[in-house]
Amino acid sequence: MADLPPARSLTAAELMRQLGFKFPAPALELATASRAPAPRFDTPLSRELRPAPERRLLHVTNGDSAAGTIRLSGVSGEVSVTADLLHEGPAPGSLPPERWRKVRARYLAESGYDDYESALAALTRWDRALEAAHSYDEVVLWFEHDLFDQLLLIRALDLLAGLDLGGTVLSLIQADDYLGHLSPARMAALLPERQRVGEDQKRLAREAWRAFGSPDPRRIEAVLAGDTSPLPYLEGALLRHLEEFPAVADGLSRSERQILRALDRGAVSFEEVFRATQGMEERIYRGDASFHRILRELAAHPRPLIRTEPGVNGPLRALRISLTPTGREVLAGQDDWVRIRGIDRWLGGVHLQGPEAAWRWDAAAGRLAAG
């Protein structure tokens, strides 16, 4: 049985991403993750980056909650959002942008996050804002330390690095807390701390984004084997992504195993299980709608790993969840979830499909293993 990090005692706080999608389920009160050390960059904030009334700024951040706080903070400039759930579903790097957005919109619609047309419109709007970066004096990227944000960051930097920006300055704020939690005053105080994006950061982001979208996940391991210090939170995020590959020991992703472990420890309600699994994360990145999708997969098989009452698609606050005998066997490493049900899962550019997974995560070795 693969090891999990111990659960922490956390303070409850609202962590609504408000991604711009119409989630099918109500949001719950979530828990905050522990704070990681603030990143340090070699390039100090120079005087020409300090905002002046006549400078045109574009702020790009991870969701409507953070965007609203930036607007309330009084900082000058326009605000845009980029908030795709890149840690879920197909993200093949070989597709041109228009086709890529359609693939993403189809996944988001099929998963119940939004209807296809609305999702496609949002994805297109977010990209168009980045593509217009050259019309601003400065573009400020506001992102957090978790997997959700780090994937958004490397995609944004990859897109921006491919544009002719002229004299536009790119700067970056990497928060060690969740931006949606911050007060407008604290958000305004972060702006002078922003750092100019250098060539090392652009180069690393492009390499990492292309590795994420590759059908060969060993390219991610190659990125991790190199110097990731220009983006201090990227290493942890990419490792967390690799942990979503089915494990050698039991065929479970880390997220799936955390759910079974929470149930084994006595959690029963949706909220209890959700909060328990958030407590097992070093950096929280998954919302309740995404979590609900995993529950549906664990329950939707003739030999399910969990049972739910009154039903997995019922009201979330009414759900009661329990481990099945098969779930206990898989959690104990006595059976294998992939071999029970097969697999059809996209992780970035990797499509795991069939009765066996082509790639698995070996937690003991800290690396991928061919299936």
What are these regions (language model features)?
Residues 111-162:
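Long, hydrophobic/aromatic-enriched structural stretches that serve as scaffold segments
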Residues 187-264:
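A conserved mid-domain beta-alpha-beta active-site/ligand-binding segment of alpha/beta enzyme cores
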Residues 262-272:
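Short capping segments at the starts of secondary-structure elements
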